Amino acid sequence: MANLFWGKKKIAVVGVNGNSMAKRIVEEMKAQGMKGVVELDAPKAYPDYYTLAQLEPDYVLFVYESAQCKVKITRVEGLLGDRLGHNVRRDTEESRQAQSYYKHQLKMIGIDPILLGAEEIPLREVKDIPWFYTSKVPMLHLHLPKAEGAEKAVCKAVQDYFRE
């Protein structure tokens, strides 16, 4: 069922290390009417980061398969080098807000997520792509165990974010 809140939103699901969990999440999102879902491979170099930025997604989710469940925000910060003392830092407020929707959904299927910490994208890789440090879209790193219903919980958390 398509929805006004999330039906046309661009959502980038990045599968890290070619895991099957990312594919299952994408399939579930499409089944729930999220038409703008795109699956990407993990960025390894500048062209991959550039491709992600060109999509201009409304939500970015890096998915890892892991024994322990963690939902982390993405940090990009450092000296840009274009002028003396120009320090850039990605605004993480929207990411923190999006992160909060995972706790309830994952606990409902018996997974207790850790919501502390951040994963860093090296500034040297993305300093020429301003979208990474100027955009406020949620960019989360989701470490998920293989559990029954995990992809549905992730889909529901994303829907809840767009509903608010």
Protein language model features and the residues they cover:
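Active-site histidine-acidic residue metal-binding/catalytic motifs
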Residues: M1-T51, P57, E77-L80
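Active-site-adjacent mobile loop/cap segments within catalytic or ligand-binding domains
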Residues: P113-E164
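Sec/Tat-exported extracytoplasmic proteins
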Residues: I25-G33, E56, Y64-E65, T92, ...
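Stable alpha-helical elements in mature extracytoplasmic
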Residues: M21-I25, A45-D48, E94-A98, Y102, ...
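Loop/turn elements at helix/coil->beta-strand transitions in domains of secreted/extracellular proteins
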Residues: K9-K10, Q32-G36, L55-V60, D112, ...
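Residue-level marker of intrinsically disordered, low-complexity segments enriched
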Residues: K9-V14, K35-G36, I109, P113, ...
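Active-site microenvironments of hydrolase-like enzyme catalytic domains
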Residues: V16, A42-S100, I121-H143
